[in-house]
Curated annotation (Swiss-Prot):
Main localization, broad class: cytoplasm
Organism: Shewanella baltica (strain OS195)
A Pfam entry, by short name: Semialdhyde_dhC_1
EC number: 1.2.1.38
Enzyme class: oxidoreductase
Similarity-based family: Belongs to the NAGSA dehydrogenase family. Type 1 subfamily.
Keyword hit for Hydrolase: no
Places the protein is found: Cytoplasm
Protein name as catalogued: N-acetyl-gamma-glutamyl-phosphate reductase
One Gene Ontology term from the biological process aspect of the record: L-arginine biosynthetic process
GO CC terms of this entry: cytoplasm
Pathway(s) this gene product operates in, as recorded in its UniProt entry: Amino-acid biosynthesis; L-arginine biosynthesis; N(2)-acetyl-L-ornithine from L-glutamate: step 3/4
Reactions the enzyme catalyzes: N-acetyl-L-glutamate 5-semialdehyde + phosphate + NADP(+) = N-acetyl-L-glutamyl 5-phosphate + NADPH + H(+)
Gene name tied to this protein: argC
Species classification: Bacteria, Pseudomonadati, Pseudomonadota, Gammaproteobacteria, Alteromonadales
Keywords: Amino-acid biosynthesis, Arginine biosynthesis, Cytoplasm, NADP, Oxidoreductase
Length: 326
């Protein structure tokens, strides 16, 4: 039995992960935490999320005493916190010997030079960063098992990389073009005008400047063009990706590349059949559908995930179970 502390449990991702861990026979929840300044401190989780009324846990402030209690009682800590907050908390808990599963972007780049540009801060813990593993569960299981610092991928990168990584040996130098739509939960729980009921509408954002673009490119080993879109639905991501493959590539070659997922229970791959967001919402699954034109050499692959599940909480749970061999 492994004991897990969840910090940032009041947000969509933290609450979703709480529900997932609560349902696991081999995991227990050491505690749920929010910042000392949070208006949610002291509230039962079910006050914020009535659908979790079966989870009788209260949100505690992350005081120094609480941090010491976590170190004494927990085997691992999950951080569903802002990037700049995770930066410091992850390094501290790692230094105390706990396994850290960070859902922010604070440890996703191995190159410290990326952080000022994409996250607005200098990375102060290069020695911890050097130990961090990118937690793309289907691809980095051995590394996840071997380290105590796991950077859980972003939602768009999870959808995109799951679709693209099998194709690496078939790609030309042409940039893959990724157009992806996410539900509004991807913007977080905080009230914002552009995600309010009357304002939300299908629109691109972060064009040629979203921080997930270099995350995808770094993990793929090739530059990409990535355009995210805000959709007028609650949860889910659909990424439609167009790539040029090497001359002479056949449909059979593409099918062989995607056979890498034959033993991956959470990834479904279909040829000439494309996924729907509704089919993956509230599941830990990724559905891929692809079609290849041998004459032009272009392939289109669509990837559907739940942004709060496979794109965040359920992938964190995958990483926890891989790390602890559960």
């Amino acid at each position: 039995m492994k004991n897990i502390a969840i910090i940032g449990a009041s947000g969509y991702t933290g609450a979703q992960l709480t529900a997932l861990i609560h349902a696991e026979a081999e995991l227990t929840i050491q505690g749920l935490y929010v910042s000392e300044n949070s208006l949610d401190k002291g509230k039962p989780l079910a006050d914020l999320y009535p659908s979790y009324s079966h989870i009788a846990l209260t949100l505690s402030p992350l005081s120094d005493d609480a941090k010491s209690k976590i170190v004494a009682e927990a085997d691992a800590v999950v951080l569903a916190t802002e990037h700049s907050v995770s930066l410091h908390l992850a390094a501290w808990f790692y230094s105390q010997g706990l396994a850290v599963f960070d859902l922010s972007g604070a440890y996703r780049f191995s190159d410290v030079a990326q952080y000022p540009k994409w996250y607005g801060f200098e990375h102060e813990y290069p020695e911890v960063l050097a130990k961090a593993v990118y937690g793309l569960a289907e691809w980095n299981a051995k590394e996840i098992a071997a380290t105590k610092m796991i950077a859980v991928p972003g939602c768009y990168p999870t959808a995109s990389l799951t679709a693209l990584k099998p194709l690496v040996s078939l790609l030309t130098s042409a940039y893959p073009v990724i157009n992806a739509v996410s539900g509004v939960t991807g913007a977080g729980r905080k009230a914002q005008l552009h995600t309010s009921f009357c304002e939300v509408s299908l629109t691109p954002y972060g064009v040629l400047g979203h921080r997930h673009q270099p995350e995808i490119a770094t993990q793929l080993g090739q530059e990409v063009i990535f355009t995210p879109h805000l959709g007028n639905f609650k949860r889910g991501i659909l990424a439609t990706i167009t790539v040029q493959l090497k001359p002479g590539t056949t449909t059979a070659d593409v099918a062989a590349a995607y056979s890498v997922y034959a033993q991956a229970p959470l990834v479904t791959v279909k040829h000439n059949q494309f996924p729907k967001v509704d089919d993956v919402v509230l599941t830990p699954n990724c559905h891929l559908g692809w079609k290849f034109d041998e004459n032009s050499g272009y392939l289109v692959v669509a990837s559907a995930i739940d942004n709060l599940m496979k794109g965040a909480a359920s992938q964190a749970l995958q990483c926890i179970k891989i790390h602890f061999n559960l």
